[in-house]
Amino acid sequence: MKLFECQNCGQLLYFENTKCESCGMRLGYLPAREAVTALKALGDPPGRPQRFRAMAEPRAQYRFCANAEHNVCNWLVRADSPNLFCEACQHNRTIPDLSIAGNRIHWRKIEFAKHRLFYTLLKLRLPHKTKLDDPQDGLAFDFLSADAPHPHGSGTPVMTG
């Protein structure tokens, strides 16, 4: 995995960082630039999604993926995009029940691994269509628990693969 650098102060950054430990700048991952980037808030009014200028790509405006609200994603989406979710989170079909204690922590670990997978898929320019884009061959993630009912009603045990 590539190491990154804060565009504001030069501090070493890691893929999952959301804040620079040196200068305090908010950070986000910009898939199109393959960069963790320092962000400058645009000062949106309350109730609207916060928009940012990415120091790695200052001409465009960005916002965080909707899953950033749960502290499980640091990827950016163009502010004018109709998608609420980033390229990686668009593939989530089922997420854990967040009302169950501990599920948010488990989901975060799974999301970090999934985001590393998508980093690699994008880097290698491999196809990664969603099930909505391609119902037959698209990719979808169902993050299930053996303790919760199966969301598709099949009653089959939870398995990986």
Language-model features, listed with the residues they occupy:
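Residues immediately within or flanking Cys/His clusters that coordinate Zn2+
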Residues: K2-L3, N17, R59-Y62, H70, ...
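Short cysteine-rich clusters marking metal-coordination/redox-active sites
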Residues: C6-C9, C20-C23, Y62-C65, C86-C89
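Cys/His-rich microdomains that often coordinate metals
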Residues: G10-L13, L27, E69-V72, V77, ...
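Short Cys/His-rich micro-motifs in 6-15 aa windows
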Residues: G24-E34, A88-L98
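A short Gly-Trp-Pro
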Residues: L27, A32-A68, P157-G161
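Short linker/helix segments within small regulatory modules
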Residues: A56-R59, L76-P82
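Fold-level signature of zinc-dependent metallopeptidase catalytic domains
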Residues: L84, T94-I95, S99-I110
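Auxiliary, metal-adjacent structural segments of Zn-dependent hydrolase domains
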Residues: K109-G161
